[in-house]
Amino acid sequence: MEERVFLRKKRGESMHHVVMKLLSYLLYYRSGLAIEVGVGGHYKPDVVAMNARGEPVLWIDCGTTGVDKLGRLVERYPEATVVIVKQREGALRRYRQSAISTLGEEALTSVVWVAVGRDLVEWLCRRLSGRHSLEVTVPDGATAVYLTLDGESGRGEVMRVGL
């Protein structure tokens, strides 16, 4: 399958955040998946998939997400899977524990916790600017993602926490 994706780093946005959005898009790819599209509420997801009624069924937030925001998301969109993506497994585990302590584990049953390998994020940050050709392989049940960027190969770990 071939698809074109256009990403632009916004003022004040880190390149790491842009790369994490790209990796999240690649990990969760499905038809209709979109990056930075509003869904009509106060918050805007980094990556989202909608159902036929225009409601989020997949909401991905990368980087910093307040625990209060997470609570509002799972309450407002109970049918959606909410994916929290961070660069470091340790940071993800601490955030998850904070969310459980604040919101309760039962409120977070629709949340998936993912850490993408920092090495892959750094590798992409050093190489991405302008247009590129990117080939991606994400095996089912991925614990890694394999990339070829303009002919150069890269690989990164994917860790899912608390499943």
List each model region and its residues.
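Conserved catalytic cores of phosphodiester-cleaving nucleases, focusing on short active-site segments
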Residues: 47-49, 56-69, 73, 82
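Short, charged/polar "capping" segments at the starts of alpha-helices
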Residues: 89-95
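A short acidic, amphipathic alpha-helical/loop segment
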Residues: 69-76, 95-98
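Cysteine-centric segments in proteins
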Residues: 26-27, 87, 114
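Non-catalytic C-terminal interaction segments of nucleic acid-processing enzymes
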Residues: 108-163
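Terminal alpha-helical anchor/extension segments at protein ends
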Residues: 41-43, 50
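Acidic-basic catalytic patches of nuclease active cores, encompassing PD-(D/E)XK
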Residues: 1-39
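Hydrophobic beta-strand segments of well-ordered beta-sheets in folded domains
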Residues: 78-85, 108-112
